Amino acid sequence: MAARSSTILSELPTGHEFSPPPFDLTREYLAAYASATRDTSAVYNEAGLAPPLAVAARALGALLDVVGLPPGSLHTGQEIEMRAGVPASAKLTLSGRVAQRSKRAGMIIAVLQFDVTANDAAEPVLMGRTTVIMPQEQESQA
């Protein structure tokens, strides 16, 4: 597992862009995903494709390698749009940004917008939005 980043999502402004290094979607990862979700369908395996939510989960995992979440964070929403099938052994690239950020009642609400491309294609195979609510850091009283 890669070391977690010291960059914390709650500290990033609207418009901040991130692009983790490319990452592989492996058959081993897909088998672990199928086991964890208890997905016994062979349809994706027979077609040589990855399940859409496996692609999204792998992409968000790569994002968490470069952007950390403070303790007490809640993942409150997820939207994904698959634009194309993803080969089971694809090299994926994620690019994203903080699309919205607001503060309310001591909490920070951040919406991350991201695109995932496969095998250096020009067009994304997946587009998504993730909403996270995090506690606002308390200023130290010195």
Regions from the language model: what does each represent?
Residues M1-G77, E139-A142:
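Hot-dog-fold acyl-thioester-processing enzymes
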